[in-house]
């Protein structure tokens, strides 16, 4: 089976799986080469370090390439929040907000001063839903 044929079939299968669940499958260009898929129901947060994105999931961390802005635009419709320009968090996994940090899955993520008011407001809106 050719790679292109395989990828087309895999995309159809994944699209069918996506339609069944509430979440979304993110396509990640992995650091080791190739493509990985992460379901947003398992995604706790995304952080940018240099030119790499680190996806913190229930199953462990994964690294990939891309921009945080592109991921934020895709995840915004699923109520993910952005405490700073370098991170996106899934509010379902927020354990604590203390001072200028938010703890998600045991990872402390800084909340920028410029976004703190908006972040806390969005988090409050999400909690009250």
Model-derived regions: residue spans:
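Conserved binding/recognition cores within well-folded domains
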Residues: 4-104, 108
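DNA major-groove recognition helices of helix-turn-helix
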Residues: 71, 118-119
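C-terminal output/interaction extensions
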Residues: 119-129
